[in-house]
Amino acid sequence: MQKKKCTAIVLAAGQGRRMGTKTQKQYLEIIGKPVLCYSLEVFQESEIIDEIILVVGKGQETYCKKEIVEKYQIQKVKKIVTGGEERYHSVWNGLKEVSKDGYVFIHDGARPFIDQEMIRRVYEEVVQHKACVADMPVKDTIKIVDTSEFAEETPDRSRVWLVQTPQAFENNLIKNAYEILLEKEEYSVTDDAMVVEKILGKKVKLVRGSYENIKITTPEDLDIAGVFAKIQKK
């Protein structure tokens, strides 16, 4: 069977307010290289990914093209598009550039430590199940709390997983789900799997990600990322 086209949508339009820096988190450096470049380079080197759609904040298009795409020779970037007000608006702006046939891998540009094996695992599952996400089992006990921050419930830890990216879908499936989402604007969603689950009622397959596949959100995350990057360079 001939391989279908695979597109990576890399989201780099977030404001990163929790980082507390003037520079947005995706452009902060980890041992001399911008956070965003790490995942772009992995997709660039992947035999599975055919093209990249890069979604950036308004006014950052030229900077990203010159200082990221051209400087680091990310030749698979087909187009740089402007993000929207919320994450799901940014995803939709990227999806509009994706063809009807094939698969799309939606990834947070603030997650620098994906690898080729993870992409391969996600690809194998999306071909079989049409919708899958990278996840990892939680290590700590989780508490459900009330509005006053008192514990209400302790869920079974074996059934609680940390959701990561990439999240991969058959193109028509995810585009259809997002079209309905944008048309109704009545759902609260925090990731792409939720869009498919809530709107289409489709089950999403979980795929092992990595505990190193952290999202850079706070200054502490950047410190941890520096350690991971140094280990990878050895």
Regions found by a protein language model. Name each.
Residues V10, L36, G94, D108, ...:
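Residue-level signal for inorganic ion chemistry
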Residues I144-F169:
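Short, flexible, basic/aromatic active-site loop/helix in glycosyltransferases
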Residues C37-D101, K184-E185:
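Conserved N-terminal catalytic core of the sugar/cofactor nucleotidyltransferase
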